[in-house]
Amino acid sequence: MVHLSADEKSAINAVWSKVNIENDGHDALTRLLVVFPWTQRYFSSFGNLSNVAAISGNAKVRAHGKKVLSAVDESIHHLDDIKNFLSVLSTKHAEELHVDPENFKRLADVLVIVLAGKLGAAFTPQVQAAWEKFSAGLVAALSHGYF
């Protein structure tokens, strides 16, 4: 797993303190579903996802985006044990939901875009490097149930 220094943990927590779990989760999931439309197949129960307006205005997209970022929030509280913390969620996505684990990386990538847009100049290269390292650990932990 990924080892984070004290400075990296501090940067991750500083970024996360500025996140609005509901709004930023909605933005990240909306971006995922628009930019990577094939991911919509995992959300067939969400109803109309036919265009940007439908996705953006979908209450189930908003609720699931909040759920996703709530899991990220909890993971940040378990930085030293993300793999074990996310083991049940990883197994669920692998065995029950059959989500392609590449989509965890895609979601991590769109979350970086949302965070960069939100933080602007405060999302420095050093902050991004710490966040990317955390994201890699998160993706690895979520993918663990597949292998």
From Swiss-Prot:
Residues 3-147 form the Globin domain. It comes from the Eukaryota. GO terms for molecular function: haptoglobin binding; heme binding; metal ion binding; organic acid binding; oxygen binding; oxygen carrier activity; peroxidase activity. One of its GO terms (cellular component) is blood microparticle. Disulfide bonds: none annotated. Red blood cells. InterPro entries: Globin, Globin-like_sf, Globin/Proto, Hemoglobin_b, Hemoglobin_oxygen_transport. GO terms for biological process: hydrogen peroxide catabolic process. Keywords: Heme, Iron, Metal-binding, Oxygen transport, Transport. Heme b binds at H64, H93. Heterotetramer of two alpha chains and two beta chains. Belongs to the globin family. This is a larval (tadpole) beta-globin. This is Hemoglobin larval subunit beta-1. It comes from Xenopus laevis (African clawed frog).
